[in-house]
Amino acid sequence: MQIRYAGHSCFIIEGSKKLLFDPMPLEDPAAVEADLTLISHAHADHIGDAFARFSLTIAVHELSGYLKSLGVKTIGMNIGGSVEWEGITVRMVPATHSSSIRQKDGTSLYMGQACGFVVEMDGHVIYYAGDTGLFSDMKLIRELYHPDIAILPAGGRYTMGPEECMMAAAWIGAKTVIPMHVNTYPEIEQDMPAFKRAIELTTVMHVEIMQPDDVLELP
């Protein structure tokens, strides 16, 4: 199995199936095909190209209904639910963040609660946090699902920053931590090498700092 980073918070995880997480706007949406798309919330930097895709899409109930009205094939879920699909288990877990679509008149259309995902595929358990602040129930994600990979936001301002991300990583206890939603824009610039050193000097966890188009190969 491999994890490819497409930038910002967009990842492609490919094993027995190809999963796409939070498809930010890309120059060529068709260049990143997937069997299943997972969207954590409705902000433009995460829902991105979902409208231009034809893969099955998982999203929270309200957002799923909105996408379905635009012709996207969807599976609606809510926090605490799970879906079995083609030998893959997808669980929807909490995130502390807003979720809305900005309309042409400048108002925002509510799209349900933001979420994260815990995905079991090919012997791995991956926690994709989506945009979120730190919350203590992350400890339950470790207790219930035991992820071996955690993909966590670390940019601050709109999500938790490096210090909170370090605490989240300790609570979740995954062997590998991949920071996201960081260093994309000036307002979310952080020192990721320092973040990596701080975690790896004090824990047994490994931090994988990925650049766009980097690929992490998993056994």
Curated annotation (Swiss-Prot):
UniProt GO molecular function: hydrolase activity
Keyword hit for Methyltransferase: no
NCBIfam families from the UniProt entry: PRK00685.1 (NF001911)
HAMAP family from the UniProt entry: UPF0173
Protein name: UPF0173 metal-dependent hydrolase Mlab_1154
InterPro entries in alphabetical order: Metallo-B-lactamas (IPR001279), RibonucZ/Hydroxyglut_hydro (IPR036866), UPF0173 (IPR022877), UPF0173_UPF0282_UlaG_hydrolase (IPR050114)
Keywords on record: Hydrolase
Family matches, as Pfam families: Lactamase_B_3
Homology family: Belongs to the UPF0173 family.
